[in-house]
C-alpha cells in the first residue's frame, strides 16, 4: 500500500510533468506566431503618392460619458493629422441620451471646426430601418439570420451599436459615390500626424490596416505600468505577426484601424452581440480573403491606473475572445485547421491559468533536484530547462522591444529604466497571477452570455501633458 508521503510525491510529479508540457505547448505556439512574416505599411512610399491616391476617410469617434478634457486632448492630436483638406472627416457618435457628453462636444466644436456630431438614437427609432434592411439582404450577417437572436432589434447599448448606426447611416448617404475608408478610435486615442497618410499608402496593397498602440501614462502607477506592459507585449510586438502574408487568421485591435466601406458593407458591418467587436470582425474579414497590413507608428492611449479598472477592461477582452472563437468560427465556415490557427492567438494567454500550479510545483522540483533527492525522470528536467531557457530568451527580446518603444513616450532614460524596473521578471510573475482574475470573470461572462452592456474604462485625461508636448500645443 502506498504511503501518504509517496502519494503526495507522485501527485506533485504528475502536476510538474503536466504543467511543463502545457508550458512547452504555449511556448511552441508563441514560436510559431513569432516566426510568421510581417506585412508592414512602407512609409517611404509616401513620396510616390499621387493626388488620386488619397482616399476619402471618415474617422468615427464613439464616446460615452467622457470627460471634456479627455476629448479635447484627443482632438488636439487630430488637429495635427496630415492629409489633403476635404478628404477626411471626424465624426463623433455619442448616444442621443448622453446629454452631458453631447454638450461637451458642442462646446468643443467651437474650438475644433473639423468636428462633426452624429447622435445615435435608440433602436426603436425609424431611422434604424437602414440597418435592418441592409442586414436582411446580407447573408454574411449570420447573427441576424441564425440563432436565438435572429432579427432581434434590441441591440445592446454599447460602442458597437454606435458604430453600426453611424456606418450604415453614412453609407446610405454616400450610396452611389466613391468608396471611402472607415477609421475609428477610442475616446482617449491620439493618432500620430501621419496616421491617415499611412492608410493612403497601405490600402493600395492591403484590405485592412491596423496601427499599433502604446500607453502614454505607463509610469503613473504600478497598475498603469503593468497594464501598459500588456500593450508592449501584444500590440507592439506579437500582433504584427498576424499579418503573415494572409496565412494566419487575425483580430483587429478596436482602434486605429481602417476598412474599405465597400468591404464592411459586403461583409455585414459589426457583430452587435459580442462583448467587444474587434476579434470577430477581423476573423470575418480573414475568412473572406482579406489581408491585413500593420502600421508601425502607434496611437497613444491611456491605460487604467488602478487594478480594479484594469480587471474591468480585461474581463471584457477575455469574454469577447472566447465569444469570437466559438459560434462565429462555425458560422464563418472555418475549417478545423483554421480554427486551430485562430485559437493559437489566445492559447498562450491562457497559460496564465497554469501558473498557480506550475510555479509552486516548479519550486518543489527545483528543491528536490538541488537536494539530490529528485524523483523526476531526466527527460522532464530537460523539458523544464528548455522551458526556462525559452522564457529567459523571450524576456530578453521583449525587454529590448520595450526599451525601444518607451522612447516614443518617455524623454528621459531614467524614466524608461524606472518602467523596466517596475516590469521586472518577478513583477511579471505576480502580474501573471493577477491576470487569472479577469480570465476567470471573462470566462464566466462568456458562459453566461454576458458583457452586452458597455462597461466603459474610466479615462482621466492622463496624457494631456504628453500630447501637448508632442504636438507643441500650449
Placement of each model-derived feature along the sequence:
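N-proximal low-complexity "stem/linker" segments adjacent to membrane-targeting elements
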Residues: 1-76
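Juxtamembrane C-terminal module of membrane proteins
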Residues: 26-56, 330-343, 371-474
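Short, well-formed alpha-helical segments that are part of the catalytic scaffolds
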Residues: 67-80, 98-104
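Short, acidic, metal-binding catalytic loop of nucleotide-sugar glycosyltransferases
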Residues: 74-87, 110-111
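A conserved acidic beta->alpha catalytic loop
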Residues: 94-108, 121-129
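Long helical/loop segments within the catalytic core of UDP-sugar-dependent glycosyltransferases
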Residues: 127-176, 193-274, 311, 315-326, ...
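Short beta-strand-to-loop acidic/aromatic patch adjacent to the donor-nucleotide binding site
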Residues: 176-190
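Catalytic donor-sugar/metal-binding loop of nucleotide-sugar-dependent glycosyltransferases
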Residues: 283-300
Amino acid at each position: 500500500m502506498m504511503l501518504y508521503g509517496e502519494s503526495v510525491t507522485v501527485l506533485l510529479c504528475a502536476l510538474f510533468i503536466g504543467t511543463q508540457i502545457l508550458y512547452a505547448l504555449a511556448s511552441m505556439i508563441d514560436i510559431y506566431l513569432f516566426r510568421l512574416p510581417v506585412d508592414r505599411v512602407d512609409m517611404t512610399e509616401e513620396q510616390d503618392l499621387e493626388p488620386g491616391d488619397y482616399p476619402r476617410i471618415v474617422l468615427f469617434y464613439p464616446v460615452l460619458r467622457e470627460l471634456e478634457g479627455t476629448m479635447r486632448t484627443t482632438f488636439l492630436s487630430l488637429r495635427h493629422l496630415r492629409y489633403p483638406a476635404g478628404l477626411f472627416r471626424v465624426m463623433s457618435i455619442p448616444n442621443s441620451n448622453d446629454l452631458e457628453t453631447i454638450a461637451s462636444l458642442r462646446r468643443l466644436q467651437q474650438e475644433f471646426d473639423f468636428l462633426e456630431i452624429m447622435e445615435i438614437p435608440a433602436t426603436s427609432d425609424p431611422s434604424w430601418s437602414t440597418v435592418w434592411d441592409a442586414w436582411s439582404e446580407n447573408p454574411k450577417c449570420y447573427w441576424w439570420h441564425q440563432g436565438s437572436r435572429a432579427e432581434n432589434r434590441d441591440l445592446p447599448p454599447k460602442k458597437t451599436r454606435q458604430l453600426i448606426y453611424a456606418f450604415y447611416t453614412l453609407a446610405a448617404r454616400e450610396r452611389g459615390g466613391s468608396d471611402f475608408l472607415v477609421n475609428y478610435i477610442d475616446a482617449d486615442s491620439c493618432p500620430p500626424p501621419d496616421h491617415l497618410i499611412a492608410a493612403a499608402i497601405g490600402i493600395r496593397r492591403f484590405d485592412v490596416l491596423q496601427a499599433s498602440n502604446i500607453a502614454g501614462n505607463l509610469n503613473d502607477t504600478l497598475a498603469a505600468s503593468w497594464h501598459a506592459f500588456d500593450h508592449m507585449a501584444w500590440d507592439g510586438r506579437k500582433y504584427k505577426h498576424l499579418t503573415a502574408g494572409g496565412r494566419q487568421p487575425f483580430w483587429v485591435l478596436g482602434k486605429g484601424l481602417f476598412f474599405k466601406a465597400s468591404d464592411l458593407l459586403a461583409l455585414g458591418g459589426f457583430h452587435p452581440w459580442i462583448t467587444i467587436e474587434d476579434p470577430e470582425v477581423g476573423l470575418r474579414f480573414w475568412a473572406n480573403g482579406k489581408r491585413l497590413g500593420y502600421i508601425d507608428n502607434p496611437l497613444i492611449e491611456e491605460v487604467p491606473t488602478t487594478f480594479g479598472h484594469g480587471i474591468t477592461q480585461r474581463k471584457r477582452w477575455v469574454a469577447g475572445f472566447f465569444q469570437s472563437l466559438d459560434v462565429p468560427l462555425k458560422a464563418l465556415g472555418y475549417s478545423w485547421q483554421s480554427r486551430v490557427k485562430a485559437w493559437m492567438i489566445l492559447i498562450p494567454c491562457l497559460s496564465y491559468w497554469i501558473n498557480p500550479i506550475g510555479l509552486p510545483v516548479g519550486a518543489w522540483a527545483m528543491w528536490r533536484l538541488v537536494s539530490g533527492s529528485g524523483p523526476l525522470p531526466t527527460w522532464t528536467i530537460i523539458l523544464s530547462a528548455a522551458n526556462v531557457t525559452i522564457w529567459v530568451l523571450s524576456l530578453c527580446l521583449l525587454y529590448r522591444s520595450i526599451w525601444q518603444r518607451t522612447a516614443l513616450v518617455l524623454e528621459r532614460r531614467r524614466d524608461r529604466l524606472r518602467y523596466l524596473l517596475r516590469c521586472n521578471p518577478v513583477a511579471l510573475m505576480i502580474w501573471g497571477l493577477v491576470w487569472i482574475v479577469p480570465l476567470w470573470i471573462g470566462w464566466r461572462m462568456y458562459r453566461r452570455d454576458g458583457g452586452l452592456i458597455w462597461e466603459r474604462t474610466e479615462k482621466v485625461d492622463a496624457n494631456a501633458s504628453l500630447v501637448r508636448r508632442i504636438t507643441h500645443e500650449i
